Amino acid sequence: FNALGLSTRDLVALSGAHTIGQAR
């Protein structure tokens, strides 16, 4: 993920947002 310029915090935020979006 470092190659994509994403940090662990960014990855968690994106994963959480994706999960919430899928739930809805």
UniProtKB/Swiss-Prot annotation:
GO terms for cellular component: extracellular region. Its EC number is 1.11.1.7. It is an enzyme of class 1 (oxidoreductase). Heme binds at residue 18. Binds 1 heme b (iron(II)-protoporphyrin IX) group per subunit. Binds 2 calcium ions per subunit. Its main location: secreted. GO terms for molecular function: heme binding; lactoperoxidase activity; metal ion binding. It catalyses: 2 a phenolic donor + H2O2 = 2 a phenolic radical donor + 2 H2O. Pfam families: peroxidase. It comes from the Eukaryota. Keywords: Calcium, Cell wall, Heme, Hydrogen peroxide, Iron, Metal-binding, Oxidoreductase, Peroxidase, Secreted. Its cofactor is heme b; Ca(2+). SUPFAM superfamilies: Heme-dependent peroxidases. GO terms for biological process: hydrogen peroxide catabolic process; response to oxidative stress. Ca(2+) binds at residue 19. InterPro entries: Haem_peroxidase (IPR002016), Haem_peroxidase_sf (IPR010255), Peroxidases_heam-ligand_BS (IPR019793). Gene3D superfamilies: Peroxidase, domain 2 (1.10.420.10). It is found in: Secreted; Secreted, Cell wall. Removal of H(2)O(2), oxidation of toxic reductants, biosynthesis and degradation of lignin, suberization, auxin catabolism, response to environmental stresses such as wounding, pathogen attack and oxidative stress. These functions might be dependent on each isozyme/isoform in each plant tissue. Belongs to the peroxidase family. Classical plant (class III) peroxidase subfamily. This is Peroxidase 7.
